[in-house]
């Protein structure tokens, strides 16, 4: 069925996939939507998904950092970055935007600015749950300080931009099985841990996180999420 493209420049489709989405289907859907956005045939979209247990390798991933995947599937993703884990209890948001034009805080044709926008989006979302997300020099993603010292990663960012249309996106740990991250060296960083909202004592549902993501997206990208 044909979907009309919104003529409102500050509106972005906001879609949520039911159940668990297999990775090859997600990748094919992202690539198709990115091509349609580039051709002016479809609207920009943020797509919220939850995956079955799997590991994805970015373009900088080293084979040695895949330690013991167990029964989880393994994929080469084509996005930037290194290894990460996706699975139940983690909210993945795939972000397909036309970066040839500005989006709120993100200038036109500025990939670094786009990544900074994704960082700000996650930090603002976490603040709504009383969690202080922080950036670290030389380390992509969002970090939180541990009560007993040190720090852990709570959200990952990995994107690809092709002819100024983005795809892939962010992964926020709500209540996943953190033990699964032991199957890899997450993002090539072995000296720091991984955490989640649940591990921090925040009892948030995926629906509550989705609502917070929508509010924060509008603030950062100046684009009203339009449910589809």
From Swiss-Prot:
A single BP term in Gene Ontology: protein modification process
Residues annotated as domain BPL/LPL catalytic: 40-225
SUPFAM superfamilies per UniProt: Class II aaRS and biotin synthetases
GO CC terms: cytoplasm
Gene3D superfamilies, per the entry: Bira Bifunctional Protein, Domain 2
Family to which this protein belongs: Belongs to the LipB family.
Protein name stated in the entry: Octanoyltransferase
Organism: Acidiphilium cryptum (strain JF-5)
